[in-house]
Amino acid sequence: MPASACLRWAETISCQYPLLRAHAARHGPLSLVHLDAHSDSWTSEDYNHGTMFYHAIREGLVDAAHSIQVGIRTPNPETHGLTILDARWLLDQGPRAAAERIRSVVGSRPAYLTLDIDFLDPAYAPGTGTPVVGGPTTQQARELLLGLRGVNLVGGDQVEVAPAYDALGQITALAGATLAADILYLIGLARAERGAAV
C-alpha cells in the first residue's frame, strides 16, 4: 500500500520526534527544514521540546550536514553541524534568499519541514507558549514557504499554537492554519512530482 501524505498540527513540539523516526524509517536520514525562534537542539539526555533535534541527529534520523534552521532568535552555541540562518539574516536578506539557501542545503534529499508558530514575530502570532520578538511577518513566512516549491518534502508539521494565549480575532490560529495549508500544498506538490498519489 502506498504511503499517504501527512501533516501534523499540534500544540506541542514533542510530537516531532516520533514523526521523524517514522519518516526516516521509510526514507532514510532526513534533511530537516526547521523554521523556529528556538533551536530545539540543546545537548541533554532528556527528551523534551528543547532537545528534540539533538536526539534526532544523534540517532541518525536527521542528516545535519543537509539540514537548516531559519529564524532562530535564541541561539544555541552547539550547532551540531546544522546550517543556521538567524532572524537577523532572514530579515536582512529576505524570504526569497532564505528559500534559495534552504534549497541549496537540502538539494533533492527527502526533507521534513517543521514550522513552530513562534517563528513569526509575536505581533503576528501572540498565541504561543514561548514568543520571541524580532521575527518575520506572516507574509514573509508565506513567501519563504512558497519559495520551497520543488523541495522533496516527505512530511511536515506546524506546532505550538496555544489558543489560550491568542489575541482577539484569533490571529495566531489564522496564521497557523494558513501556514499549515501552505505546508500541505508543498507536501502534495512534492508527492505529485515523485509520481505518488496526492
Where on the chain are the PLM-derived regions?
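Conserved alpha-helical scaffold segments that buttress catalytic/binding sites
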Residues: 1-198
